Amino acid sequence: MLDHPLNSLGFAKPPAATRVVVAMSGGVDSSVVAAELAAEGYDVVGVTLQLYDHGAALAKKGACCAGRDIHDARRVAETMGFPHYVLDYENTFREAVIDEFADAYLAGATPVPCIRCNERVKFKDLLQTAKDLDADCMATGHYIQRKMGPAGPELHCAADAARDQSYFLFSTTPEQLAFLRFPLGHLASKAETRALAARHGLPVADKPDSQDICFVPNGNYAEVIQKLRPGAADPGEIVDLSGRVLGEHRGVIHYTIGQRRGLGIGGLGDPLYVVRLDPERRQVIVGPKEALSTRIVPVREINWLGDAPLTSRSEWQVMAKVRSTRAPREAVIRPLSDTEAEVELIAPEDGVSPGQACVFYAPGDSRILGGGWIWRGAR
């Protein structure tokens, strides 16, 4: 067996002797991963997590983890002939993801719950479940690449920049990366994924991509937070940078850093933007666009994926991404500890918000060096 050539998942044994748990959301991406591996002869076990039940509100296009998605994942497993299990993770998901999401909004931050879900649920509890099932590895439908480097597995951006999910996976640890596989990361486009789904005759080949956070139907964050934290939408003042009252708002949870529309304070001359939220005073602070400009970004809870320790240098030249929709920009990391740093953006960015992630990339390379969470004090 030791002389057997490496299979496509990197193991020196036949596919039939390699068990792989596939995390199946019911969407086309993870379905294609499962189908491709099953077709190659791997011992595939499909697992779908029941994360959140929002009743009928979630049974719609654009939401994930609904009953329909579980049904779709099961149909794919039946089509390809491998076992499929549904695990109830609702309590875990609420404690690890939803509660923090609500509390972060109440504190004036703009959280990214999908990162926490990967970090605390999918790549922690589900990964452990895969090991308990005697799997050799766990595969997902994420668009990201795992490449072997001189020091072990490395995390790299997807070949398709438009689909790259590295921003949401920066917290993947080296130990998790050793067990994970991302079979779609090398594909050039989503069209290739759908073509593979059609080739396998999968019932989800034309299923729309999910858009909403699974527990936020219609993208209405404020409505969900009000249900989770009654009284969260208390009204308060909209003030300018000098403290002058300009109007009244409907509750801090309705606003995000950089927001311009929907403030209800028109007719004041130059456009005004939300530059800060003060939940304790129930104030939304607005100012001109230049007030959004940020160069110094404090980052904590850093997951560092570089070969040398973060604190082995006083400075690291990197490319940094402060929002999922923005391109990485030149930056300098100045470590304060193994898990905290000050990040200086060479060119200032607008709308840097507490609660978002700051993800680090190697200059001139596709490698992800890690990242952390932006917290108060960005300037």
Swiss-Prot record:
Alphabetical UniProt keywords: ATP-binding, Cytoplasm, Disulfide bond, Nucleotide-binding, RNA-binding, Transferase, tRNA processing, tRNA-binding
* InterPro entries tied to this protein: MnmA-like (IPR004506), MnmA-like_C (IPR046885), MnmA-like_central (IPR046884), MnmA-like_central_sf (IPR023382), Rossmann-like_a/b/a_fold (IPR014729)
Site residues by UniProt (Interaction with tRNA): 142, 356
Please name the SUPFAM superfamilies in this protein's record: Adenine nucleotide alpha hydrolases-like (SSF52402)
EC no. given is: 2.8.1.13
Q: Which reaction does it catalyse?
A: S-sulfanyl-L-cysteinyl-[protein] + uridine(34) in tRNA + AH2 + ATP = 2-thiouridine(34) in tRNA + L-cysteinyl-[protein] + A + AMP + diphosphate + H(+)
Disulfide feature: 117-214
* Lineage of the organism: Bacteria, Pseudomonadati, Pseudomonadota, Alphaproteobacteria, Rhodobacterales
User: What are the catalytic residues?
Assistant: 117 (nucleophile), 214 (cysteine persulfide intermediate)
GO aspect biological process, one term: tRNA wobble position uridine thiolation
A GO CC term attached to the entry: cytoplasm
Binding site residues for ATP: 23-30, 49, 141
Q: Which Pfam families match?
A: tRNA_Me_trans, tRNA_Me_trans_C, tRNA_Me_trans_M
Region spans: Interaction with tRNA: 163-165
What compartments host this protein?
Cytoplasm
Residues in a coiled coil are none
Q: Which Gene3D superfamilies match?
A: Adenine nucleotide alpha hydrolases-like domains, HUPs, Translation factors
- Class of the enzyme per the UniProt entry, highest EC level: transferase
Its function? Catalyzes the 2-thiolation of uridine at the wobble position (U34) of tRNA, leading to the formation of s(2)U34.
Q: What is this protein called?
A: tRNA-specific 2-thiouridylase MnmA
Family affiliation: Belongs to the MnmA/TRMU family.
